[in-house]
């Protein structure tokens, strides 16, 4: 069994917003990946952008500059 790690998740109201964030992050070299929303969370479209908390801290301003609507932003052990 693998050890759980702390991650920062961004959730979205729509699949369109989730895919836009994935494209934006890839185009701008922002680390992370799209994952199915963990069962512990109930939110919008069922997808979340996952990244390490320290990466989110470094990239927060660029993510916010994307103007992509994020439903929730949280840290979670996965």
Go through the PLM ranges and name each one.
Residues 1-4:
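Solvent-exposed alpha-helices and their adjacent loops that cap or buttress functional pockets
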Residues 6-8, 74:
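Short helix-onset patch at the extreme N-terminus, typifying the N->h transition
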Residues 53-78:
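C-terminal structural segments of small proteins and small subunits
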Residues 9-58:
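Amphipathic, hydrophobic secondary-structure cores in small proteins
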